[in-house]
Amino acid sequence: MSYIAGDKGPAPTGLEPSTWLDGADHHCFLCRAAAMYDDQQIARRQCLVVDEGPHTLAVLNLYPYNNGHLLVAPRRHVGQLSELSDDEHLEAMHTLSRFTQLYAELIKAEGFNIGLNLNRPAGAGVPGHHHWHLVPRWTGDSNFMLVTGDARVISQSIDELWSAIQAKKGWPQRHKDTKKKHEEDLRKWGKG
């Protein structure tokens, strides 16, 4: 399994960011997801971004433990919990809360594991970009669904779940002017 060996995987097909956030790691898939693109809609789809705010974004995990496995991360490339701003902390917690509500309705999740791994010894696969895992759970799911030798037993494809989240009325656009706010932030950070 290439992702265990540290292969970060390919960039989204045919897309390169037009603007990276200040301090972004160009090899980090979360920084790539937070970047600005000429075609933002296609980029968000290919980067599996299902929600974003001024300080954080939520990305479906390409290698899920369970259906709906979500990563919530700050837009900034920051590796330690103590380095997050109050706004980043608050927005991340709000995003996690919103997704527990959405997943309870959309995929009938009955419970959730929410956690984070700080640094490689604790299991962090992306130690340079802090992120929380939200893993939906169901009664009798036997901990996590099996992942054996590149064969994953997941009840719904990532494409189907991404589309279902987008189709949800009023979802995910919690910030009407996310792109405008992001562009303002880029100018403020000296990148616009």
Please place each PLM-identified region on the residue numbering.
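Long, well-ordered alpha-helical scaffolding segments within enzyme catalytic domains
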Residues: L84-A109, W162-A164
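Divalent metal-coordination and catalytic microenvironments
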Residues: C28, A58, P74, A92, ...
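Active-site microenvironments that recognize anionic phosphate/pyrophosphate groups
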Residues: M1-N67
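A short, glycine/Asx- and small/polar-enriched loop/turn
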Residues: A124-H130
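Conserved His + Asp/Glu catalytic blocks
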Residues: M1-D25, P127, V135-W171
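Short, low-complexity, charge-dense intrinsically disordered segments
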Residues: P172-G192
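A short glycine-rich, hydrophobically flanked beta-strand micro-motif that places a catalytic Asp/Glu
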Residues: I107-A122
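Short histidine-centered catalytic/ligand-binding loop motif
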Residues: L70-M93, G149-I154
